[in-house]
C-alpha cells in the first residue's frame, strides 16, 4: 500500500484529499497534519472528512508522523510548503505540491530539492487542465503571431493569489511556444487610456466571486475568427484525484522535479 500523508488536512482541500486517498486502490491515508495550534489536533482525519472513523489522528507536528508515510501531499501556502519541503528533503520523503503563489526564487528551491527527492509540482492536477496545456502549445504554434491572446480566470472569493497558478502556467506554455518571455509580455488587467493593444502581449484578467472552483479560458483572437480553449472545474475532487494519481505514479521514481505532464505522459 502506498502510504500517503496530507498536510492542511483540516481545510477544504485537505478534506477532499483525504477522501480521494481513501477512494484510491492501493493507497491509504496514514498521516494527517495541520497547524500546531489547531483545535482539531487529535481528531480522527476520517471524521473530519465526513468519511467515518479511520484511525488516523490529526497531528500538529510533521516530524512526529515522519515514520508513518512515504509521500506527502501539500496544497497549503508557500511559506508552509517550503518548511515541509525542507523536512521531506532531509527525511527522504517524496512530495506532491499543489501550492501556488511561489516566487521565482522559491521555485528555484523546489528545483534544488528535486536533486535529492522525487517531487511532482503542478499549478493544477486536473487531467483536463493538463490536456488543455498540451492543446495550448499546439494552438499557439499554429496560430503564431497572427492573433491576440488573452487569458481569463475565475475562482471563489477565498483564493488569495492572482492570477491563479493555472492561468500563469497557461501563459507560460503559450509564451514558450511563441518564443516570448512571459515576464516581459504579460499584461495584468487594464484601466484608463491604455492605447492600442500590442499583439506581442499576453493579457490576464481575474475574477473572484462566490464559490467558483476554477474556470480558465485562453482566447486566440484574429481578424474574422476566434479560438477559445476553456476548462471549468465543478469540484475540488478533480484536483485531489489527480494529486493522488501523481502520488501513486511517483512510487519508485528517481529524485527529480516532475510535473503533471510527466505523470500523464504528455511531454
Swiss-Prot record:
It catalyses: (S)-2,3,4,5-tetrahydrodipicolinate + NAD(+) + H2O = (2S,4S)-4-hydroxy-2,3,4,5-tetrahydrodipicolinate + NADH + H(+); (S)-2,3,4,5-tetrahydrodipicolinate + NADP(+) + H2O = (2S,4S)-4-hydroxy-2,3,4,5-tetrahydrodipicolinate + NADPH + H(+). (S)-2,3,4,5-tetrahydrodipicolinate binds at residues 156, 165-166. NADP(+) binds at residue 35. It is found in: Cytoplasm. Signal peptide: none annotated. SUPFAM superfamilies: Glyceraldehyde-3-phosphate dehydrogenase-like, C-terminal domain (SSF55347), NAD(P)-binding Rossmann-fold domains (SSF51735). Its EC number is 1.17.1.8. The keyword NADP applies. GO terms for biological process: diaminopimelate biosynthetic process; lysine biosynthetic process via diaminopimelate. NAD(+) binds at residues 8-13, 34, 98-100, 122-125. Disulfide bonds: none annotated. The active site is at 155 (proton donor/acceptor), 159 (proton donor). The keyword Glycosyltransferase does not apply. Pathway: Amino-acid biosynthesis; L-lysine biosynthesis via DAP pathway; (S)-tetrahydrodipicolinate from L-aspartate: step 4/4. Keywords: Amino-acid biosynthesis, Cytoplasm, Diaminopimelate biosynthesis, Lysine biosynthesis, NAD, NADP, Oxidoreductase. This is 4-hydroxy-tetrahydrodipicolinate reductase. It comes from Pseudomonas syringae pv. syringae (strain B728a). The gene is dapB.
